[in-house]
Regions:
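Sec-type signal peptide cleavage vicinity
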Residues: 2-8, 17-295
Length: 295
């Protein structure tokens, strides 16, 4: 009988200790979360990009993911964001995520949107986004960043993405015969992007070249092909168009992020006769407002 009472007392004491332990843990969690504020973060695609895709068959590809990473006041990843997190949503409807942040501290919030890990690697964080090893030129990608904390502590944050890449389109003013091999070389390009600083990283040794062999004729006043590059826009570049081995240089082209460059001219005879190419710079990527630079 004594043993049974002793066992009962021991069980009750153990239950009381467990209850106290759980209460302490709960109180610690409350204390840890004291002062944190829930914040809903929304990211929208650039509206001009959506317009381009809706009206142009050769528009940009649709992104399939948007990543977020939050940095502390020392530019180090916040706990839980050592690697970028995936936001909910789609390109058409935008992306969202709700987080809890300390309003007394300043946070740097980084965003990166692309078509997935087959195109860009983000394992080292959004300060070191890199192209996939098998790519010769980068794929479509968007970026944004914002600061939250201090005097900016709203319960909702909205950011609009911009293109991290520059898009280059070759446009012909004459019919181009099938079978031609065309290429465009950009001498100064990069293979990565630092979202926090908003600039490309890891310069290539020989630039980037995109080549295409035409399977069919390209009609007059049509786009021949497009591709993307990561470039810093620090200085204008001389691009080289090669037409079945014959070269044409296109000078004074400002290749930089969030800019669509349209190289326009007689592609059929480029490099074989004197051909003038015009570089039309679409700074809003899809708008009708362009800056024209003649070669």
């Amino acid at each position: 009988m004594m043993n049974r009472k002793l066992s009962t007392l021991m069980f009750a004491a153990a239950a009381l200790l467990a209850s106290c332990s759980q209460s302490d843990e709960l109180q610690n969690t409350v204390n840890d979360n004291e002062g944190l504020k829930p914040v809903t973060i929304s990211v929208a695609m650039p509206t001009e990009g959506m317009t381009t895709r809706a009206t142009n068959a050769s528009g940009d590809e649709e992104v399939t993911r948007c990543l977020i990473q939050i940095l502390d006041e020392n530019s180090q990843p916040l706990e839980g964001y050592e690697t970028p997190a995936t936001m909910d949503g789609t390109e058409a409807g935008g992306f969202t995520k709700t987080v809890t942040l300390n309003p007394t501290k300043t946070h740097r919030i980084l965003f990166w949107a692309d078509r997935g890990a087959d195109y860009y690697t983000t394992a080292n964080g959004l300060n070191q986004v890199t192209m996939a090893d098998n790519l010769l030129t980068p794929d479509i990608a968007y970026t944004a960043s914002t600061t939250w904390g201090g005097t900016q502590t709203s319960a909702a944050i909205t950011a609009e993405l911009q293109h991290a890449v520059s898009k280059i389109t070759l446009h012909t003013t004459t019919t181009v015969s099938p079978g031609k091999t065309l290429s465009i070389h950009v001498p100064t390009t990069y293979t990565g992007f630092n979202v926090n600083y908003g600039q490309p990283i890891n310069q290539t040794s020989n630039g980037s070249t995109c080549s295409k062999t035409l399977q069919a004729a390209v009609p007059t006043n049509s786009n021949v092909f497009s591709f993307y590059v990561l470039a810093d826009g620090e200085e204008n570049q001389i691009l080289t168009l090669t037409n079945d081995g014959a070269e044409t240089e296109i000078e004074n082209v400002p290749v930089k992020p969030d800019t669509h460059i349209i190289l326009q001219g007689d592609v059929q005879y480029a490099g074989y006769t004197q051909v003038t190419f015009t570089a039309k710079i679409d700074t809003e990527w899809g708008s009708t407002e362009t800056e024209t630079i003649k070669n």
